[in-house]
From Swiss-Prot:
InterPro entries: ConA-like_dom_sf (IPR013320), Galectin-like (IPR044156), Galectin_CRD (IPR001079)
Gene giving rise to this polypeptide: LGALS14
UniProt KW Nucleus keyword: yes
Protein name in the entry: Placental protein 13-like
Keyword Mitochondrion: no
GO biological process, one term: apoptotic process
Pfam families according to UniProt: Gal-bind_lectin (PF00337)
Domain Galectin: 6-138
Expression sites (tissue/organ): Highly expressed in placenta.
Subcellular location(s) of the protein: Nucleus
Amino acid sequence: MSSLPVPYTLPVSLPVGSCVIITGTPILTFVKDPQLEVNFYTGMDEDSDIAFQFRLHFGHPAIMNSCVFGIWRYEEKCYYLPFEDGKPFELCIYVRHKEYKVMVNGQRIYNFAHRFPPASVKMLQVFRDISLTRVLISD
């Protein structure tokens, strides 16, 4: 399967009930501290507010947050992450009525309460130290 470009940016609409599915593989061993970052922007550029950010250094806790007018809000951390060094992963972010439900390799890892209405999300960006094989938005 061919790789997608990284960073990968996509205009999106994420109504309640939709799901973002991201598959890829870290390109560095966990010892070298590779990262993965997923941002849900409220506009079509990187200066827009961030409704939801999922960021992790593989092998360390994930950090989830939002950013309003350039000011980061309270970060929430998730310590249980079923990523494996050098192995492909599937990250699914489900848009629910009150939160984003984050799953990795079929296991729920966190629920992040909405800080912006889901309908405000206009652009998705996936980047950092990964070989990206798929980004899919499902209803």
